[in-house]
A protein has these predicted regions:
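Active-site-adjacent pocket-lining segments in enzyme domains
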Residues: 1-108
């Protein structure tokens, strides 16, 4: 069921070129709204048919303009790193933070 406030927030972000980040099954909401058409996107396996018009890959994270999507809990660190990259405007900034956490994680 559509939530009016969520819809308003998504509209605001799209109208003002603000970041939208969705993980697990949440990217399907963006797909159903037609916001992923022509954009790279990923989601939890099995929900891909809801990413209408998206360029779907098997990557852990996909970033396209102001929209960042990720597969699920197991990709949360890479998802967070992509968000940091977007917010800082500096590719690799998020990876540096994750690596400094001393977590043995391999980025794709």
């Amino acid at each position: 069921q559509e939530d009016e406030k969520v819809g308003e927030m998504i509209d605001f972000c799209m109208d003002n070129d603000r970041m939208i980040a969705a993980i697990c099954a949440a990217p399907m909401i963006l797909g159903e709204l037609g916001l992923l058409s022509g954009r790279a996107a990923v989601c939890f396996p099995g929900f891909e048919s809801n990413l209408h018009g998206a360029d779907i890959s098997d990557a852990a994270v996909a970033a396209s303009d102001n929209i960042i999507t990720s597969r699920g809990a197991g990709t949360a660190l890479e998802f967070a790193a992509a968000i940091v990259d977007y917010l800082t405007g500096e590719y690799g900034a998020g990876e540096d933070i994750v690596l400094n956490m001393q977590y043995p994680y391999e980025f794709e």
